[in-house]
Structures are given as C-alpha cells and as structure tokens.
Curated annotation (Swiss-Prot):
Cited Pfam families: HHH_5, RuvA_C, RuvA_N
Residue ranges, annotated region (Flexible linker): 143-152
Cited InterPro entries: DNA_helicase_Holl-junc_RuvA_I, Hlx-hairpin-Hlx_DNA-bd_motif, NA-bd_OB-fold, RuvA, RuvA_2-like, RuvA_C, RuvA_C_sf
Species, as recorded: Halalkalibacterium halodurans (strain ATCC BAA-125 / DSM 18197 / FERM 7344 / JCM 9153 / C-125)
UniProt protein name: Holliday junction branch migration complex subunit RuvA
Function: The RuvA-RuvB-RuvC complex processes Holliday junction (HJ) DNA during genetic recombination and DNA repair, while the RuvA-RuvB complex plays an important role in the rescue of blocked DNA replication forks via replication fork reversal (RFR). RuvA specifically binds to HJ cruciform DNA, conferring on it an open structure. The RuvB hexamer acts as an ATP-dependent pump, pulling dsDNA into and through the RuvAB complex. HJ branch migration allows RuvC to scan DNA until it finds its consensus sequence, where it cleaves and resolves the cruciform DNA.
Length: 203
C-alpha cells in the first residue's frame, strides 16, 4: 500500500495530477487537481489511497491525511463510490460536510451529484459521530478563498473548471445556472471550481 508520494508535480488534468517520482509519473486522481496549480514543477507531498477493482486500479490523492480518511469513510457508505466521494470533498470545505452529517442535514447532502435522499440518510447513519477525530486536521488546513483580483486566462480557466466539475458528476443544466456569475469574474481554475461549488451548494 502506498501511503504518500513525494515528487515533482509535472502536469494537471481536469481529473488528476501527475506526480513524477524517480522518473515514474503517477496519475493521482484528486477532488480538485487545480488546487495544486501554484505548485506545478515543484516538489509536493500527496497522501494517497489505492483503489483496486477487477477493471480498474487508481491512485486517489489528498493534501492531508484527514481528507484521505474522510474519503475512505465515505467509500464505506453504501451508494457512494470514488467519484461521489471526490465530489463531496471537492468543495474545499470538508468541515461543512461534517457539520451536515452531525446535524443530519439531508438537504445539504443531496446537493452533491449522485446523492439522493436514501444515500444522504445512509451517510448520516453510517458516519454521524465517527468523523469528529478529523476536525483538527480539517479545520487547520483552511483552503484559500477565491480572489477576484487573481489574473489568468479567464476563458481557458473557466473552461477547465467546467470540465473538472463535469468529471465530478455535475450536469450541464446545473453548471449553466452558475456560469453567468462566474463569467463576471477573472479567477484561476481552482478558484472558479470553488466558487461554482459554493454557488451550487448555497442555492
């Protein structure tokens, strides 16, 4: 089992980051690969989870052990697969997810792609009271909030963000509702993703 990778971030796709370790490039699927954009061509440490099924072997990666642990706990819930767990973690604010679980807020959880009322209830039943130990690590790793003054190729960054959100399971209909607001700002791809998720989850 691979616990973590430490290597050079060489490429970013809308689903994964490529980390080169001793000449080998590993595809590491992440909730939001673009959160590593500022570290491109730098050495990073990413905590991994190896997912093995008959037809697929993938590495999933996270900035902290706590986020990886939350991902693993979500995978143990009936009805939640890797794609669904990534979508839940992609908000960059996992403490909100934990709060929803502890407060039995099904209305918040069903906003994530692939999570219906039955699955939301199952998440609460399986995880309530079992994620408290993750709080210190999750809360100490505050994500940077979108900064309107950040400069980037707005159209390209927004297009990349839309593709990343589609890969997480968000449908075109949902994305069209928030895209006009995103087009009013010039942000990085990472910031566009976080902003879009905030808009969709706060509706």
């Amino acid at each position: 089992m691979i616990d973590y990778l430490r290597g050079t971030l060489t490429d970013i796709d809308h689903q994964y980051a490529v980390v080169e370790v001793h000449g080998v490039g590993y595809q590491v699927y992440c909730p939001n690969p673009y959160e590593f954009e500022k570290e491109r061509d730098s050495v990073i440490t990413i905590y991994t989870f190896q997912y093995v099924r008959e037809d697929v072997i993938r590495l999933y990666g996270f900035r902290t052990k706590e986020k990886r642990s939350l991902f693993e706990k979500l995978l143990n819930v009936s009805g939640i697969g890797p794609k669904g767990a990534l979508a839940i973690l992609a908000t960059g604010q996992p403490e909100h997810v934990i709060q929803a679980i502890e407060e039995e807020d099904e209305a918040f959880l069903v906003k994530f792609p692939g999570v219906g009322k039955k699955t939301a209830r199952q998440i609460i039943l399986d995880l309530k009271g079992k994620v408290d130990e993750l709080h210190p690590g999750l809360f100490s790793q505050k994500e940077e909030q979108p900064k309107p003054h950040e400069k980037n190729d707005g159209n390209q960054a927004l297009d990349e963000a839309m593709e990343a959100l589609k890969a997480l399971g968000y449908v075109e209909k949902e994305l069209k509702k928030v895209k006009p607001k995103l087009e009013q700002e010039t942000l990085t791809t990472d910031a566009y993703i976080k902003k879009a998720l905030q808009l969709m989850l706060n509706r």
